[in-house]
C-alpha cells in the first residue's frame, strides 16, 4: 500500500533527524525533568512556567500532563515554577547529573487580584505560536451567559476571530470557516455536536474542565482533520488528596461534582453531572396538554487515573450526554454524544515522553412519530474509533521535538426509517459509509536565538473510502454516471495530502514581537445542513468518489506588545485564508431521507481575510478585554449567481466584544459583557407570483441582504460566602440582554393581510431580558 511505504519513509526520516540532532547536543549537558502538580489536589498543571537561572537562563512550560524537561550544564541554579492562582515555587538546585524535580505548588488566593492568564506574564510575546488563546476557568465562571449556566463555548465567542453562529447557538465560526470546520476535542475525543437544547447550552460542564485552548491559525502538526480551528478541552483528573463535593442549583439546571482519591497521592476519580428540569415546570402548567411534554438534557463527565509507577500513569475518561424533547403521545426526539478515552503516559527516559490513546466517539439521534396510523422512527449516527501515539523529545533547550501517528475508523449511518405493522409510512435504510483516516506528523520547537523562535512541522494524512456499500458517480448536472457495490474491506478510493505548518516570532525587546505563520489544513468529514444554524439532525458525509477533501491555506501576520510591566496585552493579527473544494447544495435540495445526496452537491472555493485587534488587562481588581474583528468571507460556485463571488453565511464584517470583571472588596465580583456584530448575510425575495393559489417568491443574489445588526449587554454579580471556611458557597445573579434588545432570530416574508398585493417582512426574536440566579457550593 502506498501509505505504508510513505509511512516507513516518514519514520526513517524522523529516526535520522533524532540521531543527528541528539548527537549534536549530547555533550556535557544534563537533563532536569519532573511533573508540576497542585499541592492541594494533586492535579497536574498544564502550561506551568519553569525557569532556570544561573550560568545560563532557560525556561519551558509543562505539557498536557504536567511534565517538563530541560537540558542544562552542571552548576548551581535558581529554579522558579509559577502558575496562575498558585504561589511561586523557588528553590536553589545543584546539577551534577541527570535530576528529577517534581514540584507541588500551593494555592494562593489573593482576593484583591483577579487574573486572566495562566502562563508567563510575557508568554504571548515570546512564544512562536500565534492565533492561540487559553481560557481561564475562573474567567468562564465570571462571564454572564444565558440562564446563568457558565458556558465555555459562549465565552469563546467573545474572542476576536471567533463569531457566534446565532443567538442561543453553541455553534461558532473561526476566521471565515463553517461551524463544522472546527475540531472540538474532549480529552482527545472528537465531539460532533457540542450543544444541548438546540444550542442554548454547550456540552461542556465547566465544573469538570481544567484547561481550554483554542487554535485559530498556525495549528500545531499534531492536530488535523478540520480546516479552521482546534478547541482542545481537558477534563480534571480528580483530587488525589481528599474527597470534595462541588455543585450549583440554578433556575433551570443543577449540577454536582464529586472527586477524590482511590489511593491517596497515587490514583483519583472525578464524576460530574448536570440536568435541566424545565420539564418539571411543565408538569405544573395550568394547560393540561403541556403536562406530559418532555424537555430536558443531562450529561455526565467521569475520569479516573492510576499511577502505576514512576514511569507509567493510566487515565480513563468519558462523557455521556443526552437531550430529550417530546410532545405527549405525538412526538419524540432525542440526541446525544458519548466519548471514551483510555490513555497511557510513559516516560522512556528523562527526555522522551509518550502518550498512547484509545478513543471512541459517537453521536446519534432518534425521531419518533407516535400518531396512530403514521408511526415511524428515524435514526442516524456517527461512530469513530481512534488509535493515537504521541511522543515529545527534549533534544535540547533549543529543540523540542513532537512526533506521532494516528488512525481513525469512521462509520456514518446517514439514516434509517422504521415503522410498525399497520403504519402508512414506508421503511427506508440508507447505506452506511465507512472511511479510514491515517496521519503521521513531526514538529520541532526551535529557539534559534534569544530573539528568534520557530515552530515548524509536517503532517502527512490520508483518507481511504472503504467498501461495504454502493458508490455512485455523478456529472456536473447531478446525473448518475456509474454505480458499483464494493465488498467490506475493499479500498474504494484514497486521498493523500501533505500539510506543512510553520510559525515564527522575532522578539523586538522584552515586551514586543512580530510573528508570522502558515498552515495547510485538510478536512475529510463534511456537514450538510439546510438551515443557517446548527441542528441535531444535520447530516455528515465523508469523502467519496465525488466528494474530495476540503483544503485551506492560512497565512497570518501579527504584532504583539505588552505594556505597564506586562499588565496589559495588545495584539493585532491579519490573516488570509483561501479554501478549495467547498461544498454547497443545489437550490431546492432536501437533505432529509435523500439516498443520493451527493447528486445534489456542488463544489467551489472560498476565501476569508481580516484584521483582529485584542486589548487585555490581566491583573488587578479590574480586568477584562476588548476584541474587534474586521473581516470578509466569500464563496464562489459556478452554479450559483453565475459564478460570481457572494457573501458566505459566516460573513460578519464587524464584530466587537467587551468584557469587564471587577473585584469589589473581599466578597463581591461584578462582570459585564457587551457584544455587537453585523447582521447575518441572508437572501431576500425580490418579486413574487401566484402558483396554484399560493404565493411563491423570486429570490435575489445569494446572501445579498442582511438582517439588522446584533447587539446585547449582559451583567452578573457574584457574592462569595464568608472566607476561611471549609464549606464555601456563592450566589450568582445575572441579567441576559439587560436592555431587552429584540435581536433578529429569523426574517419571514408573507402577504400583508390588509393589502395582499403587498409583501411584509416579519422579524422573529428569540430572547428579551432574562434574569438568573444560581447558588454554588463546595466542601
Language model segments and positions:
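A beta-strand signature from Gram-negative outer-membrane beta-barrel systems
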Residues: 103, 158-159, 203-246, 255-257, ...
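Outer membrane beta-barrel strand-and-loop segments of large Gram-negative receptors
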Residues: 384-390, 429, 437-439, 542-548, ...
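Gram-negative outer-membrane beta-barrel transporters
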Residues: 575-578, 597-686
Amino acid at each position: 500500500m502506498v501509505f505504508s511505504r510513505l509511512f516507513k519513509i516518514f519514520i526513517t526520516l524522523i529516526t535520522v533527524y533524532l540521531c543527528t540532532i541528539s548527537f549534536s547536543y549530547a555533550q556535557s549537558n544534563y537533563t532536569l525533568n519532573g511533573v508540576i502538580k497542585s499541592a492541594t489536589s494533586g492535579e497536574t498543571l498544564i502550561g506551568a512556567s519553569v525557569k532556570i537561572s544561573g550560568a545560563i537562563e532557560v525556561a519551558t512550560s509543562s505539557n498536557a500532563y504536567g511534565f517538563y524537561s530541560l537540558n542544562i550544564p552542571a552548576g548551581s541554579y535558581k529554579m522558579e515554577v509559577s502558575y496562575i492562582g498558585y504561589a511561586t515555587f523557588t528553590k536553589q538546585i545543584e546539577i551534577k547529573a541527570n535530576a528529577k524535580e517534581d514540584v507541588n505548588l500551593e494555592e494562593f488566593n489573593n482576593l484583591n487580584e483577579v487574573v486572566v492568564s495562566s502562563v508567563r506574564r510575557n508568554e504571548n510575546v515570546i512564544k512562536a505560536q500565534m492565533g492561540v488563546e487559553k481560557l481561564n476557568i475562573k474567567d468562564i465562571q465570571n462571564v454572564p451567559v444565558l440562564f446563568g449556566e457558565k458556558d465555555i463555548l459562549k465565552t469563546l465567542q467573545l474572542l476576536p476571530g471567533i463569531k457566534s453562529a446565532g443567538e442561543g447557538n453553541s455553534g461558532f465560526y473561526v476566521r471565515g470557516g463553517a461551524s463544522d470546520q472546527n475540531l472540538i476535542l474532549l480529552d482527545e475525543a472528537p465531539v460532533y455536536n457540542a450543544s444541548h437544547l438546540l444550542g442554548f447550552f454547550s456540552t461542556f460542564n465547566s465544573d469538570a474542565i481544567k484547561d481550554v485552548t483554542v487554535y485559530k491559525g498556525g495549528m500545531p502538526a499534531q492536530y488535523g482533520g478540520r480546516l479552521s480551528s482546534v478547541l482542545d478541552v481537558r477534563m480534571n483528573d480528580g483530587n488525589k488528596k481528599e474527597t470534595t463535593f462541588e455543585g450549583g442549583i440554578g433556575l433551570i439546571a443543577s449540577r454536582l461534582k464529586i472527586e477524590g482519591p482511590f489511593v491517596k497521592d497515587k490514583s483519583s476519580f472525578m464524576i460530574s453531572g448536570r440536568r435541566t428540569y424545565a420539564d418539571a415546570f411543565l408538569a405544573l402548567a395550568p394547560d393540561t396538554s403541556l403536562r406530559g411534554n418532555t424537555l430536558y438534557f443531562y450529561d455526565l463527565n467521569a475520569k479516573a487515573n492510576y499511577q502505576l509507577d514512576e514511569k507509567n500513569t493510566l487515565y480513563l475518561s468519558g462523557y455521556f450526554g443526552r437531550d430529550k424533547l417530546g410532545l405527549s403521545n405525538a412526538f419524540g426526539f432525542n440526541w446525544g454524544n458519548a466519548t471514551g478515552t483510555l490513555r497511557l503516559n510513559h516516560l522512556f527516559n528523562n527526555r522522551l515522553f509518550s502518550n498512547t490513546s484509545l478513543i471512541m466517539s459517537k453521536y446519534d439521534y432518534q425521531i419518533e412519530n407516535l400518531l396512530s396510523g403514521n408511526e415511524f422512527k428515524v435514526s442516524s449516527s456517527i461512530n469513530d474509533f481512534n488509535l493515537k501515539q504521541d511522543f515529545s523529545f527534549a533534544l535540547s533547550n533549543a529543540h523540542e521535538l513532537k512526533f506521532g501517528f494516528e488512525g481513525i475508523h469512521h462509520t456514518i449511518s446517514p439514516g434509517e426509517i422504521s415503522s410498525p405493522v399497520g403504519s402508512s409510512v414506508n421503511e427506508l435504510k440508507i447505506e452506511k459509509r465507512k472511511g479510514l483516516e491515517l496521519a503521521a506528523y513531526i514538529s520541532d520547537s526551535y529557539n534559534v536565538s534569544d530573539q528568534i523562535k520557530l515552530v515548524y512541522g509536517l503532517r502527512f494524512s490520508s483518507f481511504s473510502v472503504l467498501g461495504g456499500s454502493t458508490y455512485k458517480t455523478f456529472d456536473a448536472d447531478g446525473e448518475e454516471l456509474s454505480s458499483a457495490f464494493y465488498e467490506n474491506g475493499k479500498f474504494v478510493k484514497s486521498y493523500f495530502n501533505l500539510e506543512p505548518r510553520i510559525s515564527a516570532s522575532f522578539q523586538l525587546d522584552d515586551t514586543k514581537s512580530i510573528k508570522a505563520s502558515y498552515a495547510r489544513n485538510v478536512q475529510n468529514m463534511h456537514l450538510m445542513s439546510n438551515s443557517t444554524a446548527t441542528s441535531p439532525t444535520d447530516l455528515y458525509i465523508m469523502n467519496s468518489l465525488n466528494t474530495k477533501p476540503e483544503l485551506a491555506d492560512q497565512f497570518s501576520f501579527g504584532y504583539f506588545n505588552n505594556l505597564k510591566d506586562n499588565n496589559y496585552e495588545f495584539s493585532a493579527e491579519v490573516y488570509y485564508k483561501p479554501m478549495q473544494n467547498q461544498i454547497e447544495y443545489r437550490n431546492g435540495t432536501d437533505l432529509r431521507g435523500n439516498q443520493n445526496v451527493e447528486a445534489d452537491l456542488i463544489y467551489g472555493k472560498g476565501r476569508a481575510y481580516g484584521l483582529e485587534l485584542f486589548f487585555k488587562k490581566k491583573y488587578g481588581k479590574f480586568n477584562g478585554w476588548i476584541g474587534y474583528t474586521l473581516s470578509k468571507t466569500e464563496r464562489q460556485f459556478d452554479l450559483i449567481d453565475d459564478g460570481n463571488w457572494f457573501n458566505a453565511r459566516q460573513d460578519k464584517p464587524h464584530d466587537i466584544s467587551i468584557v469587564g470583571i471587577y473585584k469589589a472588596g473581599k466578597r463581591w465580583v461584578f462582570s459585564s459583557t457587551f457584544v455587537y456584530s453585523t447582521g447575518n448575510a441572508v437572501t431576500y425575495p425580490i418579486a413574487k407570483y401566484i402558483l396554484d393559489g399560493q404565493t411563491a417568491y423570486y429570490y435575489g443574489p445569494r446572501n445579498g441582504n442582511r438582517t439588522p445588526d446584533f447587539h446585547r449587554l449582559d451583567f452578573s454579580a457574584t457574592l462569595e460566602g464568608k472566607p476561611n471556611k471549609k464549606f464555601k458557597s456563592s450566589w450568582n445573579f445575572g441579567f441576559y440582554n439587560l436592555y431587552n434588545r429584540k435581536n433578529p432570530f429569523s426574517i419571514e416574508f408573507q402577504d400583508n393581510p390588509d393589502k395582499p398585493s403587498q409583501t411584509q417582512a416579519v422579524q422573529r426574536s428569540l430572547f428579551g431580558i432574562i434574569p438568573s440566579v444560581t447558588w454554588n457550593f463546595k466542601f
